[in-house]
Amino acid sequence: MIGSPSALPALVDLLGDADREIAQAAQESLASIPGTKVDAAIMAMLADGTTDRRITAMDLIVRRRMITAIPALIDTAGGTDAKLRTVAVNKLGELAGPAELPRLLDLLAKAQGSEDLEATEQALSAICLKAEKPDSSVGLVEARLAQAQPAQKCALLRVLGSIGGANALRAVRGAVSDPNAEVHATAIRVMGGWNTADAAPDLLELARTATSPTDKMICLRGYLALAGHGDLPTDQRLTMCRQAAPLALKDDEKKLLLAALGGIASV
């Protein structure tokens, strides 16, 4: 029967069938058949197959929730094939947990291009958010900032932004003063996209002291976006708008202020 372990060799062969429907049906069967023999066959595909076959193996690893395959995925993510690296990192984002965070941070440090960086950043964010307390990941991520190259540092800042919380906010706020222009700009953007009100005082101060019109606009927009949060008390939202009013000098800035005020029911 096609759904039994005895069909395993035939199903593995059919994965490479020229008919896509047949190949897909074989993959669906392999995803559902229980047992360690199927797991072993999938691991063999990952270790010694064509690029397409290895990608299929990684798909099956995630679908079968093969946690024991995480070390092999990490090895693949650090390999020489760019396509396999990206797929492996994406699958780690789906399958790995907080325990693998240090290894993913190592992969980020060695990322060889924009695709590797983006994939690893997304996987890191996904893994951190799986933690019972995502804030517990901040220390490990922040510890990599000091020695990271600018591109990696920017990715780490975005990961911290996805985690959120007071500790992550402090780390991102500190990076605003980084001498590297790219890192500074990323820190400003992450601050401007913060979605909890604990960032409001920093955003207001940054908007007041910004020497760049772009920085000011990003911080003012972020601050007024927080003022628009309906879960904040009306009085607090009004106070925030009043504090921002002296900064709204240009038409675009005034529009942001008016939009925030317009969302407050009592105004």
Give the label of every model feature segment.
Residues 99, 115-118, 214-217:
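Nucleotide-sugar-dependent
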Residues 4-16, 35-47, 66-78, 86, ...:
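Amphipathic alpha-helical scaffolding segments comprising HEAT/armadillo-like alpha-solenoid repeats
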Residues 26, 57, 88, 120, ...:
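Conserved hydrophobic register position within alpha-solenoid helical repeats
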Residues 3, 30-34, 61, 65, ...:
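Alpha-solenoid repeat junctions
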